[in-house]
Amino acid sequence: MAWATSGHELGHLGLQELIHRHMPLITNAHYWLHLGANLGGAGTLTLRVRAVDTIEAQRMRDLLVAEGYPAQHILVEPGNTISGEGHDLMHLGAKVLSLAGSNRHFHAASDRWPANVNAPGVASIARAVARWIALQAG
């Protein structure tokens, strides 16, 4: 199952609706994958990997490196630093893996294709995420 929500700009309205209508989906899900802001931005390659389970965070890091993302730019951080919708889900008891990038142009008119998109980075992230999902599915 996939669920897309609005971000902090709109107060996580989509997530709030999901919580209100389907709370068991939050806590009974095998895992929640939070694809946070700025994935694949060209200004900086910093990519934060955070999870409530450090084994899953390390697994994602390894997958990212295997798919060509530069290891020196991947920061594995504690689960308690998960932000955005992932933060909200974690505090409701969900198991969360979160990826978030960095971007000097965040919320600026200059934050667009092609100048501020790292296409190879996006491709590496997409392949790693697909592999992680396949591993979770068994």
Name every feature range the model reports, one short phrase each.
Residues 1, 105-138:
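His/Asp/Glu-rich mid-to-C-terminal helical/loop segments that flank catalytic regions of hydrolases
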Residues 6-103:
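Metal-dependent peptidase/peptidase-like ectodomains
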